[in-house]
């Protein structure tokens, strides 16, 4: 018996063309190109999720560095001082404090300075 695939093939093509809606030019109209771009877009989103983590950490460190330098410490000295003092707070929280609650951040800077001095 002959196997007819028309329904399944059309369904498969339609799925990729639906996902590729909004792509520019032939990328949203031609099945082969739409499929390639769909696969590539999924790869970009996967890689983007990994890069986002790096970028956020860089942003936190930059914010902490600026706030610490305003108080007279470099970022590396500040982090080292916190470790010597036994304070375990992550960079995300330090960044939030630096932006939203400068007084609390100054307290952490004071703790780090005391630990470095002793």
UniProtKB/Swiss-Prot annotation:
- What cellular component GO annotations does this protein have? ribonucleoprotein complex; ribosome
GO molecular function term, any single one: rRNA binding
Q: Which InterPro entries match?
A: Ribosomal_bL20, RIBOSOMAL_L20_CS, Ribosomal_protein_bL20_C
The reply on keyword Lipid metabolism is: no
Q: Which UniProt keywords apply?
A: Ribonucleoprotein, Ribosomal protein, RNA-binding, rRNA-binding
Similarity remark: Belongs to the bacterial ribosomal protein bL20 family.
List the protein's name: Large ribosomal subunit protein bL20
Q: Which gene encodes it?
A: rplT
């Amino acid at each position: 018996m002959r196997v007819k695939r028309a329904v399944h093939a059309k369904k498969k093509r339609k799925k990729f063309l639906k996902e590729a809606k909004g792509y520019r030019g032939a990328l949203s109209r031609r099945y082969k190109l739409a499929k390639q771009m769909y696969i590539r877009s999924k790869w970009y989103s996967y890689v983007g999720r990994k890069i986002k983590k790096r970028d956020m950490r860089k942003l936190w460190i930059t914010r902490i560095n600026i706030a610490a330098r305003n108080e007279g410490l470099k970022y590396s000295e500040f982090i080292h001082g916190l470790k010597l003092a036994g304070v375990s707070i992550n960079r995300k929280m330090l960044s939030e404090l630096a932006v939203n609650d400068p007084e609390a951040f100054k307290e952490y800077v004071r703790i780090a300075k005391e630990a470095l001095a002793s």
